[in-house]
Amino acid sequence: MAESEVLHRRAPSRSSWLRVRKARPHLLLSRRGRRRFGVLTRVELRRLRRRLLRAHALGGDWKQVAPAGAHVAVKCKLRARSRPAPRSPPTPSVPPAPCTASATCSLLNPRNHSTPQSRAGRPVRKVSPNVTQPVRDLGSGRVLMMLPPGEGFTFSGICRVTCVYGQLEVYGHIINQGQPPQDVFSVYTHSYLTINGVPYAEPEKSEKAIRREIRALLKPYTKLDDRNWVVRYFPPLGSIMILERMQSRFVDFLKTYKCSSYVLLQENAPVRVNSEFTTLKKIGIRRQKRKKAICLSESGLCALEELVSVSCDGCPVILLCGACDIGKSTFNRILINQLLNSIPGVDYLECDLGQTEFTPPGCVALLTITEPLLGPPYTHQRKPQRMVYYGKMNCYNDYENYIDIVKYVFRDYKREFPLIINTMGWVSDNGLRLLVDLIRVLSPNYVVQLYSDRCKFTPTLTSEYVELTDGLYTKSKIKRYRGFEIPEFGDNLEFTYEEKESSPLPVFTGHVLLSVHSEFLSSKNEKNRAKYNRIFRDLAVLGYLSQLMLPVPESLSPLHSLTPYQVPFSAVAIRVLHADVAPTHILYAVNASWVGLCRIVDDMKGYTRGPILLAQNPICDCLGFGICRGIDMDKRTYHILTPLPPEELKTVNCLLVGSISIPHCIFQNQPGPEGSVPYVTTDYNLNIPGATEKIGEREYGKAFPRHKLRQRRK
């Protein structure tokens, strides 16, 4: 009996788990780590932690009522000790003050976000964005979202934003509760936009009064269940917004063309689909990573703060310069939006011919901006105060005419609002000298020079550098003191000291230079810049032509179905700006072309037959643009399609044709008529030198053949 008990006794150094481990084969065909029973893996641990944080953010106390899987939280701590704990953001010592200009600037830089304070003075815990920003589907193409203070929602797509409670910031513009909804365009052709929750002062109300106010503000938009959900999960000092699917004639018009419809669609399919993605998809938007949004550097934030402060006290002239695709237009939009937060309007002088902001390309324009800019240039086409059609995308070999046009447009500036001047991205060789001429002619108070690590070296445009550098048509300070030289008289004319002091030539008074390091991300490079710029110019033309569409209740009609205006030959003069065309071929150049509708001083009443041809390029006001869709030689009339009203069209007496062409998608998309499409043909001779079967952009990958390195013979 004693022997049997001894036989069943286990050795003290061997356990059942050790015997099982010894009995397993030593050859393992999988590299996956061995898992102990009762311990979660990293993926399960991360999923459990996300669920606990989500439950805590939605108001549930998971410590008191343990959810499913919480019994292994203690064991999870043993696995989490091997990884370093995440650093908590610094807690400010004082509660946030009401939003100011500097606070608005910091929202554009994700590195400057601070932890907001709750009503009890304790910091609000910041977790992943998809946890602290609850989203609820309201139906009928509407979504409700709540943003804690200091957090942002970066998205792609187009939508209409309404601030129901709190304050929001988009592209530098502050949207307060009670303001009209704003249309926001966050398309993938540019950096994505971010809707930020702006910290505001804690209201002197009780919790019950705040909940009652939120319910009253949400009543016109939501149902009772939705209001209860908002009150239950409302973050302290948060903001409530409603996102709606956008319906406008501009959007519907762009969707009818293949060359522009893809701009409004999502770029690619998502990797993972969740409930938030399904909810936001109903209104046509999607959450994006914060790193894809607009981010300003510290120097950019300081420059914006200084410019906003000086613009509130006066009307400074601000000139922006920099290389191509460095972020001048983006900086201009942010500056304009921030200025509109405190002043009623901002004047804008467009000197960039290739990439205009508010007009079709090829124009020098002056206009007053009174509404925020919440999208790319082709989404906010405006009517200028004065505009001249230059007709080309650059001013190579025609600098004098370009400077004369800029001075002609600049004379209409009344100094009622701050003026922002946008310049071209040509800052090398003659482009730099032309920029020096513009600084002397326009005499800005501030020059904002954007630079980047990827751009070539550009001299710093200080006031001393501009004074000592010769332009194309203006001289440096040293040469100006030697006397004046007029091209018409050469060196045979001399002036006295009094005549020099009273000379109408521009006198440079100096400026303050603000150097801004650009951190904007751009998808353009030397190979695809021409392709991108052409697409943006076509979108600007389509944005202007969308004004031809009737209001929303009416059906959308193609352009070729609209009734054009009939303009007699004897009523307007014609001029081709970018080339010398024989008089016998002038009507071929005008037909099916993009024309500027201008007004010149000369009277056209003495001409009876026509067409009337101008001998030189005029500097005159351009009232708008149109398409010459046909010429009737029997009735001797032009058929013009334009959104200009008839009362303005009566004052037009000149048609200017430039190098800006009509987008090809307009000719290709002509539904309805059967047979051959007008102005589109496939009958051409490929044997002509220079002809090719492939129509489109040059393939740069095959443009530069790679030669193999051959070893030399010994």
Swiss-Prot record:
Residue ranges, annotated region (Interaction with LAS1L): 495-714
Polar residues bias spans: 107-118
GO biological process: maturation of 5.8S rRNA
Compositional bias ranges of the Pro residues kind: 86-98
Top EC class, one word: transferase
EC number: 2.7.1.78
Gene3D superfamilies in alphabetical order: P-loop containing nucleotide triphosphate hydrolases
Protein name: Polynucleotide 5'-hydroxyl-kinase NOL9
